């Protein structure tokens, strides 16, 4: 435990779906909870419960039946700052139980995050939470650090957004970053839709969470989609059952791999975009010809939506088909990749060489929020 150390840095990875927070130097986040803020749908139904006007994270999740749930981060980018402040407040005071004014804080951001957004993050940290120092790091770069590399291409796919980010010697190459607004939340929505075709109805925000659980427990990526569809049609070997909270048991078959197949064929949900294998290839092709070999050999997967069984083999197969025939292609899928952004942040914030990189309160007071563009890149 490093709580005795007065100035341990905090690392907070704000994902669209989950907040991962903890102390620099730890090997895993202390707190992982949903990035949701829930407000009661009806006034005063819980008599004597000391009605609150809002609930955050797990508490919102457990009371979801009587709440309307909102996600303040959409597609990796913060859209609702009031709710975001509630989430940060909950992170510091309830989850980590620290006083933010005593700890330098490392936050993460999506690649290609709008400039105004990072300024606003900086402003809230210094003015609302009075942190002594802070830094904003790009999520994909942290994932690459966590895998022990400084060069490679990261496929980071979370709940709200998917990116292909080529990184050379620790610097993201912005001209070659590919962003795809298709990630875990869209897969959950799609699974809700195709389960409806089976006659199961999932509509409310609370029921969506059940579908998300089905997705996480039962879905996988097929190595060959057409073959798998044929297998599913001819036998019931791929069927699995799932028990709903009310005891009803539902059966799911080809939905198990049709759902994540959307990552490779976005046309399934009506998106006119290339799949994640093609965006990875396009991203590499936008990079200097001299570094492509290093990128092909270091394809790092990161984020919860890369946790499907079979995804690494499928990526290997698809990229091999696109790349030059002699190219060595390697997909790295670390087992802890759900949290690799946080782990990379924990590593970075505890390096002695990083300590002069923090934006201090003094620098912020002198230069204002725009300091973040000069110090964090």
Swiss-Prot record:
Positions of post-translational Methionine (R)-sulfoxide modification: 46, 49
GO molecular function: ATP binding; hydrolase activity
Main location group: cytoplasm
Tissue and organ distribution: Shows overlapping but distinct expression patterns with other Xenopus laevis actins. In tailbud embryos, expressed in embryonic muscle (myotomes). In tadpoles, abundant in muscle from the tadpole tail with minor expression in the heart and limb buds. In adults, expressed mainly in skeletal muscle.
Subcellular location per the Swiss-Prot or TrEMBL entry: Cytoplasm, Cytoskeleton
Annotated catalysed reactions: ATP + H2O = ADP + phosphate + H(+)
Keyword check for DNA damage: no
Proregion residues excised on maturation: 1-2
Post-translation changes: Oxidation of Met-46 and Met-49 by MICALs (mical1, mical2 or mical3) to form methionine sulfoxide promotes actin filament depolymerization. Mical1 and mical2 produce the (R)-S-oxide form. The (R)-S-oxide form is reverted by msrb1 and msrb2, which promote actin repolymerization.
Family membership: Belongs to the actin family.
Subunit structure: Polymerization of globular actin (G-actin) leads to a structural filament (F-actin) in the form of a two-stranded helix. Each actin can bind to 4 others.
Note: Xenopus contains at least three sarcomeric alpha actin genes that are preferentially expressed in either heart or skeletal muscle. Due to the tetraploid nature of Xenopus laevis, each of these three alpha actin genes is present in at least two copies. The cardiac versus skeletal expression patterns of actins are probably sequence-dependent. For example, cardiac actins contain a Glu at position 3 of the mature peptide, whereas skeletal actins contain an Asp at this position.
Descriptive protein name: Actin, alpha skeletal muscle 2
Originating species: Xenopus laevis (African clawed frog)
């Amino acid at each position: 435990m490093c709580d005795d150390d007065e100035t341990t840095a905090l690392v907070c990875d704000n994902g669209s779906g989950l907040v991962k927070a903890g102390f620099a130097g730890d090997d895993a986040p202390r707190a992982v909870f949903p990035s949701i803020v829930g407000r009661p749908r009806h006034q005063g139904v819980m008599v004597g419960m000391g009605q609150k006007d809002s609930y955050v994270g797990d508490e919102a999740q457990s009371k979801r039946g009587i709440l309307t749930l909102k996600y303040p981060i959409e597609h990796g980018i913060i859209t609702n700052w009031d709710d975001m402040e509630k989430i940060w407040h909950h992170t510091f005071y309830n989850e980590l139980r620290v006083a933010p004014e005593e700890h330098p804080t490392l936050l993460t951001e999506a690649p290609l995050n709008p400039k105004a957004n990072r300024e606003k993050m900086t402003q809230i940290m210094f003015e609302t939470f009075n942190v002594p120092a802070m830094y904003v790091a790009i999520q994909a770069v942290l994932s690459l650090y966590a895998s022990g590399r400084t060069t490679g291409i990261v496929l980071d796919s979370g709940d709200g957004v998917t990116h292909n980010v080529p990184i050379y010697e620790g610097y993201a190459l912005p001209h070659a970053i590919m962003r795809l607004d298709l990630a875990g939340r869209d897969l959950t929505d799609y699974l809700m839709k195709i389960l409806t075709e089976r006659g199961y109805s999932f509509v409310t925000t609370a029921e969506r969470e059940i579908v998300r659980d089905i997705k996480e427990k039962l879905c996988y990526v097929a190595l060959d989609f057409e073959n798998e569809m044929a297998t599913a049609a001819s036998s019931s070997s791929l069927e699995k059952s799932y028990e709903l909270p009310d005891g009803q048991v539902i059966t799911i078959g080809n939905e198990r791999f049709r759902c994540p197949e959307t990552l490779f064929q976005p046309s399934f949900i009506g998106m006119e975009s290339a799949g994640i294998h093609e965006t990875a290839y396009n991203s590499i092709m936008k990079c200097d010809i001299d570094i492509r070999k290093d990128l092909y050999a270091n394809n790092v997967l990161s984020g919860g939506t890369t946790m499907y069984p079979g995804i690494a083999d499928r990526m290997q197969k698809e990229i091999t088909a696109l790349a030059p025939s002699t190219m060595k292609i390697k997909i790295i899928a670390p087992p802890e990749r759900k949290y690799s952004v946080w782990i990379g942040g924990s590593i970075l914030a505890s390096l002695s060489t990083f300590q002069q990189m923090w934006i201090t309160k003094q620098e912020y007071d002198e230069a204002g929020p725009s300091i973040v563009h000069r110090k964090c890149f």
